[in-house]
UniProtKB/Swiss-Prot annotation:
It is found in: Cell inner membrane. InterPro entries: CbiN. This is Cobalt transport protein CbiN. It is a multi-pass membrane protein. Forms an energy-coupling factor (ECF) transporter complex composed of an ATP-binding protein (A component, CbiO), a transmembrane protein (T component, CbiQ) and 2 possible substrate-capture proteins (S components, CbiM and CbiN) of unknown stoichimetry. Part of the energy-coupling factor (ECF) transporter complex CbiMNOQ involved in cobalt import. The gene is cbiN. One of its GO terms (molecular function) is cobalt ion transmembrane transporter activity. It comes from the Bacteria. The chain crosses the membrane at residues 8-28, 69-89. Belongs to the CbiN family. Keywords: Cell inner membrane, Cell membrane, Cobalamin biosynthesis, Cobalt, Cobalt transport, Ion transport, Membrane, Transmembrane, Transmembrane helix, Transport. Pfam families: CbiN. The keyword Nucleotide-binding does not apply.
Length: 100
């Protein structure tokens, strides 16, 4: 792949990521962006109002901000591990091609 095609591909990917982040904020006005846990809790309370959960979390974050911090840290760690694995396998495949 020549340099101009790769550069165009990179810019298209960056544009796609930006569009995925911005378009929902523009087109879905006044929407509640809640997590799946909150949505599930709401659905369960509508179906069975007196339901009591049978499991308690091992750790309850003291605030929503701490919960968001833990969630984003977990996402960053996962992305780092996936990025490392992709880079490792790409490097191995390039090394194999250069040996041949």
């Amino acid at each position: 792949m020549n340099q101009s095609k790769q550069s165009l591909s990179n810019w298209l990917l960056i544009g796609g990521v930006i569009a995925l982040a911005v378009l929902p904020l523009i087109f879905v006005r006044d929407a509640e962006f809640t997590g799946a846990d909150s949505q599930a809790e709401k659905a369960i309370s509508e179906v069975k109002p007196g339901y009591e959960p049978w499991f308690k979390p091992l750790f309850e974050p003291p605030s929503g901000e701490v919960e968001s911090l833990l969630f984003s840290s977990q996402a960053a760690l996962g992305a780092g591990i996936i990025g490392y694995a992709v880079g490792l396998y790409k490097g191995r495949s390039q090394q194999q091609r250069h040996k041949e």
